[in-house]
Amino acid sequence: MAMNSPSQSPSAIQDGFQWELPTDQLPSYFPIVCIMLVAIIYTFASSNKSIRALPYINTTGLFSSTNARRAWFASAGNLLDEAKEKYPHKPWRVMTDLGERVVLTPELMEEIRNDPKLSFKEGLAEDFHGSIPGFDAMQFFLRSDILIDIVRKNLLRPNPSIIKRLSDETDFVLSRHIGQTQDWTELNLSQLGADLVGRLSARIFVGDELCRKDEWLQESQHFHHSWFMGAMKLHDWPRPLRYLAHWFMPECREMKKALAAQRRILADYVAKRRDEKQAAISAGQELLKYDDGFAWLEQETEVRGLPYDATIATGLQLMIALVSAHATTDLLQKGMMDLIQHPGATEQIREEVLGQLRSEGMTATSFYNMHLLDSALKESQRVRPSEMLLIRRRVMGNVKLSNGLYLKEGTRTWMDTAHMKDPAIYENPEQWDAKRFAKLRSQPGGASSAQLVSSTRNHVGFGYGKHVCTGRFFAATLLKVALSHLLANYEWKLAPGLAVDWVDFGNTRLLNPQATVLIRRKEKPEIDFSSIFDA
């Protein structure tokens, strides 16, 4: 997950408060010495001989780790290219903005994919400080399968009502940004993508009433911004000191304020629905049925005999943003940019989309049959996945791999994704080919392995194994709804003079956040989405 935050040293964080230690009792450098000693002890206590034998690509000692973290954050792509050249088919270590990581080779993928001692959830909790106040809002969902069950039961194959709400919200967002004019409008692609994905997700997970409520949207954006910034800056501190440090960080204070505001809003929302339910029961009337994330969450907590309140409801929104929003936004932006750069392929995809919408309407069936659009999105994800290293894990118990590498409990691992551009697997792997997976899909077995939502050893864009992204089916539906509107009724192109470039932010390679596109509504729109569901 990408977080646009510069590295910050402990000394910079300390500027926000005053040390109350008498200068005649302790030297001024005493706190720094303590921090360094804690870091030394922690580093060596959590390492082992097998891991220390692996080559480091960006640091050789403890005292160079700060510079190594900053170098990684600014130019991780260059470091990864260097590592792949120096250590092909071998594991290696790297000091990242999140700490030390062991990078495993794709040859080990089948071996680790379902190992119960390698946990995705625990890695996520550690990276985002799940035990620290404010960040701990995610803990309920990390310790249970409620979110996974919600998605499996309600979003694997979205019903017509969900698709219609996604379509209505897409029309609302695009009209808000572009209006009905046929004049070209210059838009920041990152902002447009984030607004589309954020609002479409909110329409389904928080419901029709809240998804356009200004106070909710503002507090939600405020929370996620301060949460990401605070999470990143806490990684500048040795782990044993992070709990203490967070009390003095303005980002963490802002995060808690926004979290409290969200809980207040949701407390009223939960109480309103509860009162409606009780009133209907008392009057002997049929209960009003909701079909959104909060209704699904209430059902799942009830089945488990757990309380349902604003705290749990807020945690649901946090987890959705953490595990899905960034990756979906990233794929939408990259997919749009790839289509802009390949007008011939875009025209073929547009014709396919229009044909399906006219014959099948906007349905799960028509989305399944949009082979070219599906293929183009999967290709964008292959060429530039949301993270350059994927399949993050935390080792929960000592593990010895078949190559002899011993992973001690607490070790953090990533998987190299070089095989997604391996010429032995993909022809012309550096080239974006919209039809690549459509062709594979037409081959025997391709229907189950070459779709956007397919997870295979050769394409791990949504993860692999027991921790593969459960929400990938909903993400695919959301993307196809948004792009159906854009392809059918809008024209878009690069802004004049814009060079397409990519920026490294730690493990993520993003489209330049300043990139803009020109968009206008067609004089004669191809599809009337307001009536397509009436057929």
Q: In which residue ranges do the predicted regions lie?
A:
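C-terminal helix/juxtamembrane-tail motif
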Residues: M1-T23, L405, N507-A535
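N-terminal membrane-proximal hinge/A-helix region immediately C-terminal to the signal-anchor transmembrane segment
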Residues: N4-S144, N458
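Conserved cytochrome P450 K-helix E-x-x-R motif and the immediately C-terminal K′/meander segment
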Residues: W72-D81, S359-L405, E409-A418
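Charged/polar low-complexity intrinsically disordered regions
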Residues: M95-E100, P106-M109, N114-V206
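Classical protein tyrosine phosphatase
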Residues: I112, T328-E351
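Cytochrome P450 heme-thiolate monooxygenase catalytic core
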Residues: I163-D330
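Cytochrome P450 heme-binding "Cys pocket" and the immediately downstream C-terminal segment
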Residues: A345, S455, K466, R472-L510
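Conserved cytochrome P450 K-helix/beta-meander segment immediately N-terminal to the heme-binding cysteine loop
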Residues: M415-S449
